[in-house]
């Protein structure tokens, strides 16, 4: 990116700096989590560390753009399925920006990472992953949007929310590419517990 374009982006980033912090619209603030207001599943990242980490360029749009590797303890007996959702509440869009939605993760799984998002093929907008997980909708219609906050907009938070479900989702009961709102409704009455891993990333002048 040229210096002029960077300067323009920086100016816009500063102009819209206060457009951030849409925490009230986060996934875990939806009605489905009414009985589970706090995370109880401990999540860590062998790559990036504990929650509260600062992401390196490697995990951004300016690096490989891969999702961090995550691990968590074995699920309780009542857990029938997991799902994972990643979002940025600091995007200047008036609502959190969804970076990725992944459904139908088996209850025996205790890790999630880049290899789970390997794309085999795409048919009519439906992405087929090696892992078999269903990919939900984000604004770029890709498997995962790597962090790329506007220059000058300060650090953004990236929340990776793992949800343990007491009932499996019906594969035929949700869209082939479900969005966040649809998932929020689909999991009402099914949330057994959930975990949160959060990291920050800020675009800098020395990026490519």
From Swiss-Prot:
SUPFAM superfamilies: PEBP-like (SSF49777). Phosphatidylethanolamine-binding protein; part of the gene cluster that mediates the biosynthesis of the antihypercholesterolemic agents phomoidrides which are dimeric anhydrides. Within the pathway, phiB is not essential for dimerization and its function has still to be determined. The pathway begins with the highly reducing polyketide synthase phiA that catalyzes the formation of a C12-fatty acyl-ACP, starting from one acetate and 5 malonate units. The hydrolase phiM is involved in the release of the C12-fatty acyl chain from phiA. This is Phomoidride biosynthesis cluster protein B. It comes from Fungal sp. (strain ATCC 74256). InterPro entries: PEBP, PEBP-like_sf, PhiB. Disulfide bonds: none annotated. Belongs to the tstB family. The gene is phiB. Phomoidrides A and B (also known as CP-225,917 and CP-263,114) are potent inhibitors of Ras farnesyltransferase and squalene synthase. CP-225,917 and CP-263,114 inhibit Ras farnesyl transferase from rat brain with IC(50) values of 6 uM and 20 uoM, respectively. CP-225,917 inhibits squalene synthase with an IC(50) value of 43 uM and CP-263,114 with an IC(50) of 160 uM.
């Amino acid at each position: 990116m040229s210096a002029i374009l960077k300067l323009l982006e920086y100016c816009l980033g500063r102009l819209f700096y206060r457009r951030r912090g849409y925490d009230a619209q986060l996934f875990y603030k939806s009605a489905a989590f009414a009985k589970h207001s706090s995370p109880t599943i401990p999540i860590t990242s062998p790559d990036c560390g504990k929650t509260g980490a600062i992401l390196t360029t490697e995990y951004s749009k300016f690096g490989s753009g891969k999702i961090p590797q995550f691990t968590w303890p074995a699920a309780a007996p009542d857990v029938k399925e997991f799902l994972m959702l990643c979002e940025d509440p600091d995007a200047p869009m008036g609502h959190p920006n969804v970076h990725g939605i992944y459904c139908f993760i088996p209850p025996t799984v205790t890790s999630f990472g880049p290899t789970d998002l390997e794309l085999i093929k795409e048919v009519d907008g439906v992405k087929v992953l090696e892992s078999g997980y269903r990919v939900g909708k984000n604004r770029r219609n890709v498997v995962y949007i790597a962090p790329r906050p506007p220059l000058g907009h300060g650090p953004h938070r990236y929340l990776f929310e793992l949800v343990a479900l007491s009932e499996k989702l019906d594969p035929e009961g949700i869209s082939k590419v479900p969005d966040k709102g649809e998932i929020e409704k689909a999991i009402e009455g099914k949330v057994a517990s959930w975990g949160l891993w959060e990291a920050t990333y800020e675009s800098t002048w020395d990026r490519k």
